[in-house]
Amino acid sequence: MLTAKDIMTNKVISVTPDTSIEELSSILVKNEISGVPVVDDSGLLYGIVTENDLISQNKRLHIPTVVSFLDAAIYLESSKKFEQDVKRLTATKVKEICTRKVVTISEDISLVDIATLMAEKKVQLLPVVKAGKVIGIVGKRDMVKAVARQAE
């Protein structure tokens, strides 16, 4: 039976609570990932932040509405408002938008239990934690890869 330890990503990219949203966005894009754990100075799990947190309607942060047309960005709001939103966005810290109540797993949990947890809790990323520290992360992509490997 496969467990989280078998499929988790071991080299976890993380950020701190004081990481800027600008830096977070760059990390997510550069590494082609949808979210990262937030860890404090001692390496303990503080929270988790995802792309959804960046665009969530119920957060105080507002990303301007943009339409892409023929490779040009068209802002659906005034340019002055856009500039204000960008300034506010770059000044915002991860601690202001991250989820503090994080659903975590241990490395010995089965894939079936991981899938159930993801579905029930409606989460896409599960930090694998040992003694309060993140030792890995399991995302939906890891689950799909595991299923594909078993099918071969």
Residue spans of the language-model regions?
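Generic detector of well-ordered alpha-helical packing
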Residues: 41, 52-54, 143
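Gly/Ser-rich helix-loop-strand patches that form or flank binding pockets
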Residues: 121, 125, 139-151
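Short, basic and Ser/Thr-rich N-terminal targeting/leader segments
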Residues: 31-32, 122
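N-terminal short leaders/motifs
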Residues: 47-57, 61, 81-83
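Short hydrophobic beta-strand motif reused across regulatory alpha/beta modules
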Residues: 47-50, 137-143
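Bateman/CBS regulatory modules and CBS-like beta-alpha motifs in cytosolic regions of diverse proteins
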Residues: 1-27, 33, 38-41, 45-46, ...
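A short, polar/charged loop-to-alpha-helix boundary motif
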Residues: 55-70, 144-152
